[in-house]
Amino acid sequence: MSSRRTSIAVVGTFDTKLDEFLYLRSQILEDDSSINVILIDAGRSVVQHEAVTIKQDEVAKASGFQGFENDFMSLPRGDLVKTMIKGAVKVVGRLKDRDEIHGIISLGGSGGTSIASAVMRELPVTFPKLIVSTVASGDVSSYVAETDITMMYSVVDIAGLNEVLKAVVQTAAAAIVGMAKAYVKKLNNNGHGDIKTTKKGIGITMFGVTTKGVNAARKWLESHGFEVYVFHATGSGGRSMERLVKENRLHGILDLTTTELADELAGGVFSADSSRLTAAAKAGIPQIVSVGALDMVNFGPKDAVPKKFQERRLIEHNPSITLVRTTKEECEELGNRIAQRLKENCIRPDLTEVWLPLRGVSALDIEGQAFYDTLADNALFKAIKTSLDGSEISVKELDTDINDPSWSESIAKRLSELIELKG
């Protein structure tokens, strides 16, 4: 069994926060003096210090920028930041590919966090990533996106070494040391830093109103030897699943809960983006797509629901989330979008199917419940069937709702058959 010296990359803008980064370095080494700390300067101007491993001009040149000595400092701030991100991504990527780093950490305000997070998002899921940031107590979705970046709030600004900031940095240093050592341990044991499994991985999308059906499908798949990853369909959940497909970590997809498309269409808070429903199709892996929770759009507190939706059927799911029923017209458009994205991206339509639960697409859409609306549902189903007619993507209709046990077992079993068919 080979062993490695744990190495941690520290990336940031040293021209504005050198003292803070040097303190971070000292705390990492105080925790374990054997660790190799690589300081990577992604700032605006060159900093001369013996502790800096990869200097700012090296990062800029790694981006491919020409004429560094004469033109770099004259770049507009936005262009300069983009250049440094591009260069830092290249530098850090090379270090990772050569097994020369086992974790990465940064400190920053909004600018430094933007640079560091852009670099970290290019690293694989499970590789240790930590940012101490002044913006970490707010909405960090634009920084974290679909990755596993850990954000730690700095409490005070990263501007001078006071006792509060030093305590936060000490904690962050200990955290990244522990994370990096755990990663190295996996490398030494497995030969790679990922979770070790010999099972084929399945991704399933879930929402509260599709939980019963998803759990039943999950249990069936697990009992038949699959490793199941459930993704909460909150925008970031769907994007995370798509990313893991791109990283070749999943062998099949049960996209039972495509509700993020409804939020994308109507401006809800759980929107993914236009790449949703494309990764598995482009990868050619087996997938079964359904229409879970397309009966709803998600907004914040009830008083925050846009006026144009106030006259619709609303359900206050909890104090933070209000559900709005999708209309017949919206459901028709959603059906068209699902079909179109699959048709445009599928390289193996023979391994892609769409399943429709005719008696309800969520726990709130069955007879007697608040969102039960056969006209809207039928518009959704018809649009999918019409748009996919003539394609090689098959559509299956079941006379049940999406949480029925018979539905769950049938759809899970069928996915396993498609995986076996692919080989």
PLM features: residue spans?
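Short, acidic/small-residue loops that bind anionic groups at enzyme active sites
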Residues: G103-S106, I115-V144, Y153-S154, Y229-A233, ...
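N-terminal phosphate-binding or glycine-rich loops at protein starts, especially the Walker A/P-loop
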Residues: S2-V47, G103, T113-E122, T126-I131
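Cap/lid and interdomain-hinge subdomains that line or gate substrate/regulatory clefts
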Residues: F72-P76, D139-V209, E333, V395-E397
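Gly/Ser/Thr-rich loops at beta-strand to alpha-helix junctions
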Residues: G12-D19, H102, S106-A116, A136, ...
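Glycine-rich phosphate/diphosphate-binding loop of Rossmann-like nucleotide-binding domains
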Residues: K17-R25, I38, V47-I54, K196-G235, ...
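C-terminal non-catalytic interaction/assembly regions of soluble proteins
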Residues: S2-S3, S7-A9, K17-I38, G268-G423
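Short Gly/Thr/Asp-enriched flexible loops that form oxyanion-binding sites at enzyme active sites
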Residues: S106-V125, V214-R218, I366-D373
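Phosphate/nucleotide-donor binding subsite
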Residues: E50-R98
